[in-house]
Swiss-Prot record:
Originating species: Salmonella phage P22
Domain of life according to the entry: Viruses
This protein's name: Eai protein
Amino acid sequence: MSMKIGEHMKPVIELLEELNGNDTDAKLKLLALVISEYMLNADVTGFEVSAGRMKVAVDISVED
């Protein structure tokens, strides 16, 4: 299943591609760091987002 990127997300995708080229792993790691920074600043350890048929869940855990 292929999903289209919304117009509002294109600037974010363009910035990721400018910073990391075609390295999908690096792009995902950068996005994860940005999301986790926002979550930690808001004192949130998990959230879930639904968009149509897609659902994304994000949890932060601390490993000892």
